[in-house]
Amino acid sequence: MFRKIKDRPRFNTHVLDEIAELQHRPTRPPEDFQTKLPAGYTYFGQFIAHDMTRLARSARSPSANPVDTDLLEQLESPELDLRSLYGAGLDDPEVPYDLNTGKFWANHQDGNRIRDIPRDNDGAPRIADGRNDENVILSQLHAALMSVHNQLIDWYGGTSDAYPHARRELTLLYQRVIENDFLRRLLDAKVHRTLFRNSDLSYEGTFLKARRGFAARITVEFVGAAMRFGHSMVRSSYDINERHDLDLDAVSYTHLTLPTSF
C-alpha cells in the first residue's frame, strides 16, 4: 500500500522533541484573523479523508504499537469513488437500499430528502463507513449525499436500473467539487495547476484516475501527517440552523438529540 522508504533513520529525535514542545505552547490567533474558508469545508474535508483511506492491522500484525506500515491494510480506494457512501453497492448488507428503486433508505425522510442517516434500533449508524457519524455536521453531509443520489434515481427513471447511472453522476459531481471548489480554496494556485496539469492524475473518460502505468496509492506520510491539517480547522463553536454557538460537545451529538434539536 505504501511506498518503501529508503534506508535512513526513520525519526530525528531532536526534531520530534521540538514538535512535541510546540504542541504545548499556548497560541492565540490575531484579533483581526478572519478565515475565508466557510466552516462546512472542514467537515467536507473529513468526509473526503474517510472516503480515501481506512487503515486496519493485517492478520500478520502484532497487537503491540507502533505498527510497521508494511502490516497495515488499506480498506478504501484512494480514487475518490464514494465507497464510503455506496459501500459494495446494492448487495452491501451494511447499507439499507430499496432494491426496487436503487434508492437509499432511512428512518427519517420526506420523500427523497433524508433527514438523518439510517440507524438500527440502538441508534448505531447503518452506513458504509461508520466514521461519518462522528459529528452532526459530517453525519448531515452524508445524509445530504444520500438525498442527492435518491433525486438522481428519479432523474434517471426511478427504478433499480437507474442505480449505476445515479452513482456515476454523483461520483463525477463529487470529484469536480473537490477539484474546482474544495482544493482551489485550500491550495496555492500554482500548486493546484501542478497537481491537475503536470502530475500523474488524468480524467479517464469522465472520472479522475491515476494515469495509465501509475498505481493509485497514498503515502503513509500523507495519511499520518499531511492530511491531518484539517484538525486545526475545527472551530470552537458553530451555528446550525436556528441553533447558535453550539460547542463541540453539542456538535458531537448522540443520535437521540438530532430529531428534536436540529
Annotate each predicted stretch with a short phrase:
Residues M1-G87, D91-Y97, N107-G111:
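Carbohydrate-associated surface elements
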Residues L141-A144, L152:
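Mobile, glycine-rich extracellular loop/lid and propeptide segments
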Residues L152-Y163:
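Inter-helical turn/loop segments and adjacent helix faces that build the functional surface
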Residues R167-Y253:
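Extended amphipathic alpha-helical segments with heptad-repeat/coiled-coil character used for oligomerization
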Residues T254-T260:
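Conserved small/polar residues in nucleotide/adenosyl-binding loops
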Residues G102-N121:
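Surface-exposed intrinsically disordered loops and tails
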Residues P118-N135:
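Acidic/His metal-coordination segments adjacent to aromatic residues that form catalytic metal sites
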